[in-house]
C-alpha cells in the first residue's frame, strides 16, 4: 500500500473514532466564542498587569460595546535566586506569577467564576546590568502570556459547561 494512501486511511479512521466517542473541539460549543468576546478585562496597574491584560484582550477577541462580563485580576510576582556562584551571586532566577481572577456578571456584579493560575519559569541573570534587566522583562512577558493562555482556557471550559445540556 502506498504511504500516502496509508496516511489518508489512518487519518480517516482517527476522525471516525474521535467522532464516535463524542469528541468535539472546545470552541465548537455554542456560546464559547461569543461568551469570551463579551468579557471586559480589568487588569491591575503595573507592567505585568498591562502585559496580562493585553494578552487577555488579544486572546478573548473582545468586541466593542457593553460587555456582559468583567474579569477582575489580582496578580502577585515572586522572584527566587537559584544557581549561586562561589561568590554567592545568583546566576539564575525562578520567576513565579500568580493570577487570581474573578469573572463577574456586569449586570449584578455577582461572581460567576473564581480561579487562580500559577506560572513558574526560570531565566539567566547576566553580569551586565542591562542584560539582567532584559532577561527579567522577558521572563515577565513569557509568564504573562502563559497566564493569559491558561485563564482563557479555564474560561472557555467554563462557558462550554454553561451551555452543555
Label every model-predicted segment.
Residues 63-70, 74-116, 121-138, 142:
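Surface-exposed short loop/turn segments
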Amino acid at each position: 500500500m502506498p504511504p500516502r494512501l496509508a496516511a489518508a486511511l489512518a487519518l480517516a479512521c482517527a476522525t471516525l473514532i474521535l467522532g464516535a466517542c463524542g469528541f468535539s473541539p472546545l470552541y465548537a460549543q455554542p456560546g464559547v466564542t461569543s461568551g469570551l468576546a463579551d468579557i471586559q478585562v480589568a487588569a491591575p496597574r503595573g507592567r505585568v498587569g498591562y502585559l496580562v491584560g493585553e494578552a487577555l484582550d488579544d486572546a478573548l477577541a473582545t468586541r466593542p460595546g457593553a460587555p456582559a462580563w468583567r474579569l477582575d485580576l489580582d496578580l502577585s510576582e515572586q522572584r527566587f535566586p537559584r544557581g549561586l556562584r562561589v561568590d554567592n551571586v545568583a546566576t539564575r532566577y525562578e520567576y513565579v506569577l500568580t493570577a487570581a481572577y474573578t469573572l463577574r456578571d456586569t449586570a449584578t456584579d455577582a461572581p460567576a467564576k473564581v480561579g487562580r493560575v500559577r506560572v513558574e519559569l526560570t531565566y539567566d541573570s547576566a553580569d551586565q546590568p542591562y542584560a539582567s534587566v532584559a532577561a527579567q522583562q522577558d521572563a515577565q512577558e513569557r509568564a504573562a502570556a502563559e497566564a493569559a493562555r491558561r485563564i482563557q482556557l479555564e474560561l472557555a471550559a467554563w462557558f462550554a459547561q454553561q451551555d452543555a445540556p
